Swiss-Prot record:
GO biological process, one term: cytoplasmic translation
GO molecular function terms noted in the UniProt entry: rRNA binding; structural constituent of ribosome; transferase activity
Pfam families: Ribosomal_L2, Ribosomal_L2_C
InterPro entries in alphabetical order: NA-bd_OB-fold, Rib_uL2_dom2, Ribosomal_uL2, Ribosomal_uL2_bac/org-type, Ribosomal_uL2_C, Ribosomal_uL2_CS, Ribosomal_uL2_dom3, Ribosomal_uL2_RNA-bd_dom
Record Gene3D superfamilies: 2.30.30.30, Nucleic acid-binding proteins, Ribosomal protein L2, domain 3
Upper classification of the organism: Bacteria, Pseudomonadati, Thermodesulfobacteriota, Desulfovibrionia, Desulfovibrionales
Role: One of the primary rRNA binding proteins. Required for association of the 30S and 50S subunits to form the 70S ribosome, for tRNA binding and peptide bond formation. It has been suggested to have peptidyltransferase activity; this is somewhat controversial. Makes several contacts with the 16S rRNA in the 70S ribosome.
PANTHER family: LARGE RIBOSOMAL SUBUNIT PROTEIN UL2M (PTHR13691:SF5), RIBOSOMAL PROTEIN L2 (PTHR13691)
Domain of life: Bacteria
Bridged cysteine pairs (disulfide): none
Signal peptide: none
Organism: Nitratidesulfovibrio vulgaris (strain ATCC 29579 / DSM 644 / CCUG 34227 / NCIMB 8303 / VKM B-1760 / Hildenborough) (Desulfovibrio vulgaris)
GO terms for cellular component: large ribosomal subunit
Protein name per Swiss-Prot or TrEMBL: Large ribosomal subunit protein uL2
Length: 276
């Protein structure tokens, strides 16, 4: 994938960059693997905002992705590489030897016509999924499970990967994209390789409207609000807020650590992100 820079025919296009989509081989999704997607606009079942700055955006169909990779021992052929509006990564449509079709995240280096395999006997090549107990130390991984059979939860965004740095008993040690090193059960499955669409981080939206197409709404600063709306609001003229940065509910933010010290998974974290 390469990034294409647009001609500056308007202020909105001057700094706008787009993907060239050269890896895409089909524009319409597999009908049996899509479902309708209802917009939530950041609201929960009570209708209250639980995730601010969401709403609008283009209508989407949800592509059902196989994060479990539990079809062990059955080879599959990569039929197509497709665009997915619901994520930054590309997706690959697999045609299994028994006739089933599934979508997976498309890793770097995968091409139309390649053969993919899941299970303990799979080779160490991009796109194959197997338990980390069977993967050599130093391998780059994505779509990593936290519990066996739960499905991949780590490293699913475009260009991300974790590195298998060691094995200790029933645990595998992973270095995550954040720099955190943590233990994960070696029985958990992971997919070999790095998630594709690596140049996604170099995309510049160029204008506010393009963010709205994605369903992102404006972010209003607390100091620009009224006192009723935010602890930093109010004051005569422009002000700094008069206190350390906080959320609208008074929780310290911008660097303040809010992780629960008694969280059970803390004992599995060898090195926190940001630590030297």
């Amino acid at each position: 994938m390469a990034v294409r820079k647009l001609k500056p025919t308007s202020p909105g296009r001057r700094f706008q960059t787009v993907s060239d989509f050269e890896e895409i081989t089909r524009s319409t999704p597999e009908k049996s693997l899509v479902i309708g997607l209802t917009k939530k606009s950041g609201r929960n079942n009570n209708g209250r905002v639980t995730s601010r700055r969401r709403g609008g955006g283009h209508k989407r169909l949800y592509r059902i992705i196989d994060f479990r990779r539990d079809k062990a021992g059955i080879p599959a052929k990569v039929a197509h590489i497709e665009y997915d509006p619901n994520r930054t990564a590309r997706i690959a449509l697999l045609h299994y030897a028994d006739g089933e079709k599934r979508y997976i995240l498309a890793p770097v280096g995968i091409r139309q016509g390649d053969m993919i395999l899941s299970g303990e006997g799979a080779d160490i090549k991009p796109g194959n999924a197997l338990p980390m107990s069977r993967i050599p130390v130093g391998t780059n991984l994505h779509n990593i499970e936290l519990q066996p059979g739960r499905g991949g939860q780590f490293c699913r965004a475009a260009g991300t990967y974790a590195q298998l740095v060691a094995k200790e008993g029933k645990y595998a040690l992973l270095r995550l994209p954040s720099g955190e090193v943590r233990k994960v059960l070696a029985a958990c499955c992971a997919t070999v390789g790095q998630v594709g669409n690596v140049n996604h981080e170099n995309i510049s939206l160029g204008k506010a409207g393009r963010a709205r197409w994605l369903g992102n709404r404006p972010k209003v600063r607390g100091v620009a609000m009224n006192p009723i709306d935010h602890p930093l609001g109010g004051g005569e003229g422009r002000s700094s807020g008069g206190r350390h940065p906080v959320s609208p509910w008074g929780m310290p933010t911008k660097g303040y650590k809010t992780r629960d010290r008694k969280k059970a998974s803390s004992k599995l974290i060898i090195k926190r992100r940001g630590q030297k």
